[in-house]
Regions:
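Auxiliary Fe-S-binding modules of radical SAM enzymes
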Residues: 1-17, 174-252
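N-terminal [4Fe-4S]-dependent radical SAM core
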Residues: 1-27, 33-48, 63-70
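Conserved AdoMet/S-adenosylmethionine-binding subsite of the radical SAM
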Residues: 62-66, 70-73, 82-204, 209
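Short glycine-enriched, charge-decorated loop/helix-capping segments at active-site entrances
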Residues: 42-46, 144-150, 218-226
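Active-site beta-strand/loop signature of hydrolases that rely on acidic residues for catalysis
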Residues: 79
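Short, conserved loop/turn and helix-capping segments at secondary-structure boundaries
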Residues: 51, 148-151, 228-231
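Short cysteine/histidine-rich metal-coordination sites, predominantly Zn2+-binding motifs
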Residues: 49-59
Length: 252
């Protein structure tokens, strides 16, 4: 049987935000979501021109282990659950070397009614220390408009991961006029509070740093003219989500 391959978009060798400590981050190719504020639309297509074996991908990361110290490690992001078997094997290799692992995911491919898929996902979770999950919008209809997909399986994955005892970091992108209404944030707060393994909640302010990528790809940018949130709006959202109540909250 041929070895599982992973299709990698890019890597970051000294990441400081996608998990605890210093991280080596592998960004995989392929994503079914079409988030209106996506800053990496070039990763949507499932291209196969950058194939690596799990051992090759892990070996490239492990060269940077001296930077990780006690709390850093390896994060895999991008179209990760579309390449679940590859990620599972990379994380198995990482745990064999006592490397901390984090899965940064949109959770869109989560398939709780597919027994074979869930068996593979359980195998992945066995070697996953942290799941970083983007909860983009708590209202399902608004979520469909924002991303092109329902959030039902995404919320179900959050609950499943928490029930398995895996630590969670939750992120929410704050877009003025779209994802910032107080009632929606309160509902999101209630959902997150019911997840017993959440260690951190983050507000990610909307930005336009990826706008040029949409332009280069010839894709109309759906949020043209939308402003970035103010510091006051960010602080208000952080209060509504009680971000300082969680164990891994950044210390001032």
């Amino acid at each position: 049987m041929s070895e599982t391959l992973g299709y990698i978009h890019s890597v970051e060798t000294f990441g400081l935000v996608d998990g605890p400590g210093v991280r080596y981050i592998i960004f995989l190719q392929g994503c079914a979501m079409r988030c209106q504020y996506c800053h990496n639309p070039e990763t949507w297509a499932f291209t196969k021109d950058t194939a690596k074996t799990p051992q090759e991908a892990f070996n490239a990361a492990y060269r940077y282990r001296n930077y990780w110290r006690n709390n850093g490690g390896l994060t895999i992001s991008g179209g990760e659950l579309l390449q679940m078997d590859f990620v599972s094997e990379v994380f198995r290799l990482a745990h064999a070397k006592k490397v901390q692992t984090a899965l940064d995911t949109s959770a869109q491919p989560f398939a709780p009614d597919d027994a074979e898929w869930m068996a593979r996902f359980d195998k992945l979770l066995e070697n996953t220390d942290l799941v970083i999950l983007d909860l983009k919008e708590i209202d399902d209809e608004k979520h469909k408009k924002l991303t092109g997909h329902s959030n039902k399986n995404i919320l179900a994955m959050a609950q499943y991961v928490a029930a398995r005892g895996v630590h969670l970091w939750i992120r929410h992108v704050l877009v003025p006029g779209l994802t910032d209404d107080a009632d929606g944030l309160r509902q999101l707060d209630s959902f997150i509070k019911a997840l017993p393994t959440v260690r951190r909640v983050e507000i990610l302010p909307y930005h336009t740093l990826g706008l040029f990528k949409w332009q280069n790809l010839g894709i109309p940018y759906p949020l043209d003219g939308v402003r970035v949130p103010t510091a006051e709006e960010i602080a208000a959202a952080e209060q509504l989500l009680h971000v300082q109540d969680y164990p891994d909250a950044p210390k001032d």
